[in-house]
Amino acid sequence: FCLWDAVDDSSNFQRNYSTGEVEVEGSVIYHKTEYRERRNHYAVFWANCPVDSFDTTRDAFCGVYGGPADPQAVRAGHCSGSIAHGWAPVGALHIHLTLAPGESHSILFGLGYIENPQQEKFIAPGIINKTRAHAMMERYATDAQVDAARAALRTHWEQLLSTYHLESGEEKLNRMVNIWHQYQCMVTFNMSRSASYY
């Protein structure tokens, strides 16, 4: 997980390594770093099926001297159930699945962002209000729901990007003008006055 500012996260270790905090509930990891003290938002990572194990600390998942290219948990065949209290939180879910030749199986993973009003942050002391997270996970719980959401997103961007269209005979120029230039204008519009692009 990024702790809301990727540049700061990669350099301000004396602070960041003392703030990481998560909750785990079934196959859902809630990243709530600084939620108690100064934030009204948290991240949520989930799978739409039961998990066999999980990790929420980078050292437990990757190994103390390991990295994401060859994580210790993957080599071991399972995660350790680590709960982050400081250091570097991660969201790792392990689902053991055996498929017969030609068989397929769908598993949906989701990563979301939730904001709660100040007066609705907690449901009990230290327990974050997960009502909005549960509603979001219910909206994307099946293949059909995810396919419908992707189709709606595709339609939105196609409509947005189809207002102006160039056919120059030069494929790369067409792509730059028809997609990336317009997309960059939209990103600039949405992110203007933002202190961070992370």
Describe the residue ranges of each PLM region.
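Beta-strand-rich interaction surfaces with strong enrichment in secreted/lumenal proteins
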Residues: 81-84, 94-99
